[in-house]
């Protein structure tokens, strides 16, 4: 079985994230969405809420699992018996950062990272932008996967 983890904070999960998962499922048997817990990072939504929102989104697809973790990503990948890490790339800066991390993960754990370039129409969408819009009371529906609601 080809299993990948898709790690991130997902605060919140956007249509860009959704696109990465759907595209990864075209060549993976299973994708585990790993919500990293970082006590030093202030989040808009509690971890449990993010897990719940993403689980609801993929409730009809048994190939997608959702779990939170508070360890190194490579340790989470090992715990989930994943052979791959999937990451989305929006910019050159993202690529340079992810390339370095992918190299370290390969050297430390033998885990390959698959970089998926964002679809052009989604490159400007980020969780940071969505949180800023929420802060000012704006409707963020166009930036969320269909059916996802933010309370």
Swiss-Prot record:
Site-annotated residues for Transition state stabilizer: 17
Swiss-Prot/TrEMBL cofactor(s): Mg(2+)
Coiled-coil regions, chain positions: none
Catalytic activity: (R)-4'-phosphopantetheine + ATP + H(+) = 3'-dephospho-CoA + diphosphate
GO biological process terms on file: coenzyme A biosynthetic process
Pfam families tied to this protein: CTP_transf_like
UniProtKB keywords: ATP-binding, Coenzyme A biosynthesis, Cytoplasm, Magnesium, Nucleotide-binding, Nucleotidyltransferase, Transferase
Binding positions for substrate per the UniProt entry: 9, 41, 73, 87
Class in the EC hierarchy, top level: transferase
Positions with a binding annotation for ATP: 9-10, 17, 88-90, 98, 122-128
UniProt-listed Enzyme Commission number(s): 2.7.7.3
GO molecular function: ATP binding; pantetheine-phosphate adenylyltransferase activity
Chief place of localization: cytoplasm
NCBIfam families in alphabetical order: coaD_prev_kdtB, cyt_tran_rel
PANTHER family in the record: PHOSPHOPANTETHEINE ADENYLYLTRANSFERASE
Function: Reversibly transfers an adenylyl group from ATP to 4'-phosphopantetheine, yielding dephospho-CoA (dPCoA) and pyrophosphate.
Assembly notes: Homohexamer.
The family this protein is said to belong to: Belongs to the bacterial CoaD family.
Name of the molecule in the record: Phosphopantetheine adenylyltransferase
Species of the source: Phocaeicola vulgatus (strain ATCC 8482 / DSM 1447 / JCM 5826 / CCUG 4940 / NBRC 14291 / NCTC 11154)
């Amino acid at each position: 079985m080809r299993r990948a983890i898709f790690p991130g904070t997902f605060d919140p999960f956007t249509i860009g994230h959704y696109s990465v998962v759907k595209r990864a499922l075209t060549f993976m048997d299973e994708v585990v969405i790993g919500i990293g817990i970082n006590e030093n990072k202030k989040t808009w939504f509690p971890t449990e809420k993010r897990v719940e929102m993403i689980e609801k989104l993929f409730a009809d697809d048994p190939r997608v699992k959702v779990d939170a973790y508070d360890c190194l990503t490579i340790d989470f990948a090992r715990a989930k018996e994943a052979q791959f890490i999937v990451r989305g790339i929006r910019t050159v800066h993202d690529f340079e950062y992810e390339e370095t991390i992918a190299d370290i993960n390969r050297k430390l754990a033998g885990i390959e990272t698959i970089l998926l370039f964002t679809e052009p129409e989604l490159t400007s969408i980020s969780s940071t932008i969505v949180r800023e819009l929420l802060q000012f009371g704006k409707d963020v529906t166009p930036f969320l996967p269909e059916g996802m609601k933010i309370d």
